[in-house]
């Protein structure tokens, strides 16, 4: 696994968790002595990136998080606003972007994304095994993506999956999944309490 590439790691952490009912970022799925969800996300990116940024609305609540905290430029604007804020704040030409609520991302998949060659503004995988839905919160963005995303945002769009179609983006294709995550477990996220039950069941039967 590469160590400290000249690439930023950006975690979109938000802060509302309205559908979840509690602050899911503080869940300790790996035991009381283990990391919380947000700490785990930081730990995933640290070996790969020269800096790790966390975009969130409540930086004051995370004084001990070992990352650079970035205030969302447009609080309440969703993941698109978070990605824009992260790209604006990063100090490298490229960023590996993930969401804070994806607890079972395969580290080897992240490393592969970080090294995957591509031309354009972004490297955005499609869902697997049934392609079609882009995964813009498990992706690589160049700084060149910032201006078009800002334009789309200014035009009123708030859906990240729609906004990224304004970019010159590349899909690494099914080979990425087949080589590094054939079950596509990395796409599991926590949006509702029912999602938590699924992830807990997965963690109970898988060594992660």
UniProtKB/Swiss-Prot annotation:
Q: Which InterPro entries match?
A: MobA-like_NTP_Trfase (IPR025877), Molybde_CF_guanTrfase (IPR013482), Nucleotide-diphossugar_trans (IPR029044)
Q: Which GO terms describe its biological process?
A: Mo-molybdopterin cofactor biosynthetic process
Q: Where in the cell is it found?
A: Cytoplasm
Keyword DNA-binding included in the entry's annotation: no
Give the family, as the similarity comment puts it: Belongs to the MobA family.
Q: What does this protein do?
A: Transfers a GMP moiety from GTP to Mo-molybdopterin (Mo-MPT) cofactor (Moco or molybdenum cofactor) to form Mo-molybdopterin guanine dinucleotide (Mo-MGD) cofactor.
Name used for this protein in its record: Probable molybdenum cofactor guanylyltransferase
From which lineage does this chain's organism come?
Bacteria, Bacillati, Chloroflexota, Chloroflexia, Chloroflexales
What gene name is listed for this protein? mobA
């Amino acid at each position: 696994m590469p160590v400290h590439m000249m690439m930023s790691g950006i975690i979109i952490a938000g802060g509302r968790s309205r559908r979840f009912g509690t602050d899911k970022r503080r869940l300790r799925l790996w035991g009381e002595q283990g990391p919380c969800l947000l700490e785990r996300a930081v730990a995933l990116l640290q070996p790969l990136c020269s800096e790790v940024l966390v975009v969130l609305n409540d930086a004051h609540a995370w004084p001990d998080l070992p990352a650079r905290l970035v205030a969302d430029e447009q609080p309440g604007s969703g993941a698109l606003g978070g990605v824009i804020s992260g790209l604006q704040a990063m100090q490298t030409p490229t960023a590996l972007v993930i969401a804070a609520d994806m607890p079972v991302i395969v580290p080897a998949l992240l490393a592969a994304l970080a090294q995957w060659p591509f031309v354009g503004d972004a490297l955005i995988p499609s869902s697997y095994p049934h392609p079609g839905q882009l995964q813009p919160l498990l992706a690589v963005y160049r700084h060149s993506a910032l201006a078009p995303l800002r334009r789309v945002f200014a035009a009123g769009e708030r859906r990240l999956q729609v906004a990224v179609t304004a970019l010159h983006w590349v899909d690494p294709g099914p080979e990425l999944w087949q080589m590094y995550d054939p079950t596509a477990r990395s796409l599991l996220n926590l949006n509702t309490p029912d999602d938590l039950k699924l992830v807990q069941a997965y963690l109970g039967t898988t060594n992660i």
